[in-house]
Design a protein with these regions (language model features):
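Transmembrane alpha-helical segments and their cytosolic interface motifs
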Residues: 247-266
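Conserved functional hotspots at enzyme active or ligand-binding sites that engage polyanionic ligands
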Residues: 10
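A general structural signal for well-ordered alpha-helical packing
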Residues: 224, 228, 252, 267-271
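Short, membrane-interfacial amphipathic segments enriched in basic
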Residues: 244-248, 280
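Low-complexity, intrinsically disordered or signal/transmembrane-proximal segments
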Residues: 2-5
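Soluble catalytic domains of membrane acyltransferases
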Residues: 13-192, 198-199, 258, 269-346
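Long, charge-rich alpha-helical interaction segments
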Residues: 201-245
Length: 346
């Protein structure tokens, strides 16, 4: 079965998604020591928005974009992670579209037409679209060469939509890529207007020169050069800030950190397991986020339900206040534990 047959239109409203997104935004901000948003005024209110961030911290980069506004965001990701039908459906539910590359096979590139149409429909419905134009993540300094996908989607959107289309370059700068509870600055640059009349001008020029076949290539190249010029200073930009007195703070909250550590034991087990399995350590902080804020609370919710059953059947008679504490405290503690623990252990 082809992948597109498994997928639905990602711009359609989904109640479960709408419930989960506020939770993800809250936990993402809790995970970080601080988040600074710079240049939000550069995001137009009445245009189709295509975000173009640098890619350094795997899943967390996407969460950074999702946490920047109130609207759902449609993302693009490499197609090879969609190979299993179950995973493909989950990613589709999360409003993530597959992008095929030449390494996926020349025949598979035609599937990008469906992705591009879906992206344009999402933009027309008012949802921002985000694609990492470097095509892969890298924690090395500097910007990788930009791929053509973002330019092609932007040009198609400008041709098909009756509203302005802009690419907003985004710089994601983490204080320390190896630290889980680090600081993050998200800087939005000046938008790049994608004018559909530019394509007509290039077509005229190409017709006069007798080379109409290069029109799309010229337009794509021109847009990528503009984007690279805008993105490079954003991802190299550093913010100076005053560090908190880490030693004093650590001493003050150390007793609470010990309790928090107990509630993080399931998460520690998961991260330790995957740390030994993965070769690309750039994924480690993303795994920590999933373990601490998605899987760990579910485990403690199950434990709370088991405790509720035990208390309800009177296996261990306890005062009412102790029973309520035993049942309702684990999940909130599991949610608060990462910020407390990683505030001491960095």
């Amino acid at each position: 079965m082809q992948l597109v047959q498994l997928m639905k239109l990602v711009y359609e409203n989904n109640r479960v998604y709408n419930i989960l997104v506020p939770y993800v935004r809250w936990t993402f901000r809790r995970m970080l020591q601080r988040v600074n948003y710079v240049g939000l005024e550069n995001i137009p209110k009445d245009a189709a928005i295509i975000y173009s961030p640098n890619h350094v911290n795997t899943l967390l980069d996407a969460l950074a974009i999702l946490s920047s506004g109130k609207s759902p965001v449609v993302f693009a990701a490499r197609a090879d992670i969609f190979r299993k039908p179950t995973i493909a459906r989950i990613l589709n539910f999360l409003k993530i579209l597959p992008i095929y590359r030449i390494r996926d096979g020349a025949d598979s590139l035609v599937e990008n037409d469906w992705t591009f149409r879906n992206a344009v429909l999402s933009l027309n419905a008012g949802l921002p679209f985000c694609i990492f134009p470097e095509g892969r993540h890298s924690q090395e300094p500097g910007l990788l060469p930009l791929r053509k996908g973002i330019a092609r989607i932007a040009i198609k959107a400008a041709e098909d939509l009756d509203k302005p289309v802009v690419i907003v370059p985004v710089g994601l700068v983490y204080d320390d890529l190896k630290t889980f509870r680090t600081g993050l600055t998200i800087r939005f640059g000046q938008p790049i207007a994608v004018d559909d009349t530019e394509g007509l001008e290039l077509a005229d020029m190409a017709e006069e020169s007798g080379k109409p076949a290069v029109t799309g290539q010229k337009r794509t190249r021109r847009l990528l050069l503009k984007l690279e010029e805008k993105m490079r200073p954003l991802q190299e930009w550093k913010q100076s800030h005053t560090r908190h007195p880490v030693i004093l703070r650590s001493i003050l909250i150390a007793p609470f950190a010990l309790i928090a550590g107990l509630f993080l034991l399931p998460a520690f087990g998961l991260t330790t397991f995957f740390d030994k399995k993965i070769s690309d350590k750039a994924f480690l902080n993303s795994i920590r986020y999933v373990a601490c804020y998605l899987i760990n609370p579910i485990i403690w919710l199950i434990i709370s339900l088991l405790l509720l059953i035990i208390v309800a059947f009177g296996v261990f008679p306890l005062p009412l206040w102790a029973s309520l504490l035993l049942i309702f405290a684990p999940v909130p503690m599991a949610l608060l534990a990462p910020a407390i623990w990683y505030g001491v252990v960095r």
